[in-house]
A protein has these predicted regions:
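Membrane-helix boundary/interface segments in integral membrane proteins
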Residues: 1-12, 347-350, 374-381
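N-proximal low-complexity "stem/linker" segments adjacent to membrane-targeting elements
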Residues: 3-96
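Loop-to-transmembrane boundary segments
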Residues: 10-21, 355-368
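Membrane-embedded multi-pass helical conduit in multi-pass membrane proteins
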Residues: 34-67, 73-76, 362-449
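Non-transmembrane catalytic domains and loops of membrane-associated enzymes and transporters
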Residues: 75-351, 474-476
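Cytosolic juxtamembrane regulatory segments of multi-pass membrane proteins
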Residues: 82-94, 430-442, 461-476
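Membrane-interface alpha-helices
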Residues: 315, 444-471
Length: 477
């Protein structure tokens, strides 16, 4: 009888979830169409009408596609992996980052870890050495020290040149993987077409203030909704440096180019003649692959191969330290803007050869982002000058409501806290500000950059990273 009661309760819960999901879907698709009609009626401009229709189509496409996304489950696939952690000025966290990797459940006999200190000016190297001495797996850990700062791409190249095994896992030096993250991250590589996999990022320091919490829920949206959509078609545009995995052979040509900029001790990477004559060494592409934005460059090259797929694993969770000051956040967004530009230009060379849905996702998203500054300026400044205040009000109301829908669907799919809804609505104003300032500046200064994603190396994580893996707030769907 007890079993029957439990079964009945489970059926009621399942029915309730289906009803809730149905209501969210109805609200999402119905309201998006209403928003499009409001935007179209609010302005007589052809460009605004075209943008509104394109944005509506993209949102509907995204929600339909991401609804069918599911991560790969564990089937016992355990390839040999090399975990790479490039670091600069991370004395407060580097030991904990290394420990979380070895505290995971991936077989240590099939895992090697390489940590690169890229010319740190603090005590990062000493922290790496302490982790090596204290680890029972020190024979699986290799430390590399650059006497001066060469940049993240050279740090990656130094390690990948020495990597063993088929799969290379890259982890940022301020990011902490869950116990099962690496095990779940490599599962899609059972498919020989998969060249790269992105993990799912969250903010470990979301309780430090409003800005970190805003970023936490924004990450949930960008990973689960956007990458979930892209993953359906095998065209994830960026494997985040927080946690990403690549087939080593798929990225060797770029690593060869990056290694040339590093220490003379860096071993040459053997490439065949065809690879040496690949597009990485010619024209604009040669400059782009040596620009900031390593994550997008690696992803673009991995995806460029014939039949290549790049996917996302929502169940492979990494928790990163996000900026807790506006200055750090804006610097990060500037670097990401430039990286997006470089990765987008590279993708123009090959995305047209992918499937129609993959090409549509890529080119339409780029079209909408490139036009976004002009659209925001028109709605917020030009339209009011013409006396069409209701048009501006309709634009703001519609944009905020889209933020509401993103927060609601993130809660639905990723099972975040329901507070993701109001926080995502608040983030709309942050997005508008970034579009009018950082994004525009990044468009006209695409070649500047450096190690801009690191905060200041002063974070202490003893209170943020317990000895056991922190309890998941999310339950990957």
């Amino acid at each position: 009888m007890y079993r029957n009661v439990r079964h009945a309760a489970a059926v009621r819960m399942s029915s309730g979830n289906r009803l809730l999901n149905g209501l969210v879907a109805l609200l999402t698709y119905g309201s998006i169409l209403v928003i499009m009609l409001v935007w179209l009626r609010s302005s007589q401009d052809t460009i605004l009408g075209l943008y509104s229709a394109s944005m509506t189509g993209f949102l509907i496409f995204m929600y339909v596609a991401t609804a069918g996304y599911k991560p790969e489950t564990d089937t016992g696939f355990r390839p040999e992996v090399t975990v790479i952690i490039p670091a600069k000025n991370e004395e407060g966290v580097i030991e904990s980052v290394i420990r979380t990797v070895f505290n995971g459940d991936y077989p240590t006999s099939k895992m090697r870890v390489i940590v690169v200190d890229d010319g740190s000016t603090d005590r990062t190297w000493e922290g790496m050495q302490r982790a090596e001495k204290e680890s029972e797996f020190s024979d699986r850990l290799k430390l590399v020290r650059h006497e001066r700062n060469y940049g993240k791409r050279v740090a990656l190249a130094s390690a990948i040149a020495d990597a063993r095994g088929e799969i290379v896992v890259c982890i940022d030096s301020d990011s902490f993987v869950d116990k099962d993250a690496i095990r779940l991250l490599v599962q899609p590589f059972r498919d020989g077409r998969v060249m790269a996999v992105s993990g799912h990022g969250e903010a470990i320091n979301k309780d430090e203030g409003i800005l970190p919490r805003l970023q936490h829920y924004w990450y949930a949206e960008m990973f689960r909704l956007l990458k979930g959509m892209e993953s359906r078609f095998g065209c994830v545009s960026c494997c985040s440096g927080m946690l990403a995995a690549y087939r080593r052979e798929a990225i060797l040509p770029i690593i060869h180019e990056w290694a040339k900029e590093g220490p003379t001790a860096t071993a040459p990477i053997a490439l065949d003649d065809m690879e040496r004559e690949s597009w990485v060494s010619r024209g604009m592409a040669s400059r782009l692959i040596k620009s900031p934005g390593e994550d997008r460059i690696l992803t673009a090259f991995a995806l460029s191969g014939k039949g290549a797929r790049v996917v996302y694993q929502s169940n492979s969770v990494v928790r990163t330290i996000v900026p807790n000051s506006s200055r750090q956040f804006l610097r990060q967004q500037l670097r990401w803007t430039r990286a997006w530009i470089h990765g987008s230009v590279l993708s123009w060379r090959f995305m047209w050869r992918k499937s129609f849905p993959a090409s549509l996702v890529s080119y339409l998203f780029q079209f909408l982002l490139i036009l976004s500054p002009a659209i925001v300026i028109l709605w917020l400044f030009v339209v009011p000058i013409r006396g069409e205040w209701m048009g501006t009000a309709g634009f703001l109301a519609g944009t905020i409501f889209v933020g509401f829908l993103h927060g609601l669907n993130t809660w639905k799919y990723q099972r975040t806290s329901i507070e993701s809804v109001p926080y995502r609505m608040m983030f709309v104003f942050v997005s508008l500000f970034i579009t009018l300032t950082i994004f525009l500046y990044g468009l006209v200064t695409p070649w500047k950059g450096g190690w801009l994603t690191r905060a200041d190396g002063t974070h202490q994580v003893s209170s943020m990273v317990p000895s056991e893996t922190p309890p998941l707030e999310t339950v990957a769907q």
